[in-house]
A protein has these predicted regions:
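Sec-dependent bacterial lipoprotein signal peptides
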Residues: 1-19
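Cross-family detector of peptidyl-prolyl cis-trans isomerase
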Residues: 19-203
């Protein structure tokens, strides 16, 4: 699995480097097309599911008619399960959750792992002993992130790949260009069920 992803990232970087040598492409030039190609390559790895750890999740807001969306890779979230938790239920849209997360853009030559644009902890790496998981409502995130959360269980640790359409789309922020695919490392620490769990304090 790691070998496949390494080859995928290497191919992306080689393409970028070749273009830059010709003076044609900056880090964010042709960004939309490159992000679409990146998600397509991730989708192919997920579809092969060589290590049986991939999940392909249809966006939660598209209803149950999966056949209508078959073949459109921009309507799915691609999740690779890094660690299975011990929880038995997944959060619903109106539930609240505590999560550790780190978000980054697709890999580029300048940022081979992808430029980090946000994370829930202050240090370079997560310290589960001291870092308090971020609290928010399940449905308060972008569609792709919420979709993944609604399939996770407490303790799960996933890497999720979100097409731009299920992220910020044509909207840009100070650290996220428009039409950016998003990559998140997410650990679901706790679920608070709406109308039942009123104490959302940590520990």
């Amino acid at each position: 699995m790691k070998k496949l992803l390494t080859l995928l990232v290497l191919g992306t970087l080689l393409t970028l480097t070749a273009c830059e040598e010709k003076g044609e492409v900056g880090e964010y030039d042709n960004w939309e097309d490159r992000n679409i190609a990146f998600i397509d390559s991730i989708a192919k790895v997920a579809e092969q599911n060589a290590d049986s750890r991939w999940m392909i999740l249809k966006a939660y807001n598209l209803g149950d008619s999966a056949s209508l969306y078959k073949g459109n890779r921009n309507l799915f979230v691609y999740a690779h399960k890094q660690k299975d938790g011990t929880g038995t239920v997944s959060p619903l849209f109106n539930d609240s959750v505590r999560v550790h997360y780190s978000g980054r853009l697709m890999p580029t030559e300048l940022h081979p792992q992808g430029l980090n644009f946000d994370k829930s902890y202050s240090g370079q790496t997560l310290d589960e002993e001291t870092d308090v998981p971020y609290l928010n409502r399940t449905g308060s995130y972008v569609v792709g992130f919420t979709t993944a959360l609604m399939h996770m269980k407490e303790g799960d640790n996933w890497t999720i790949y979100i097409p731009a359409y299920l992220g910020y789309g044509a909207t840009s922020t100070s650290s996220i260009p428009e039409q950016s695919a998003l990559i998140f490392d997410v650990q679901l620490a706790r679920i608070y069920h709406y109308g039942y769990d009123t104490d959302t304090s940590w520990h």
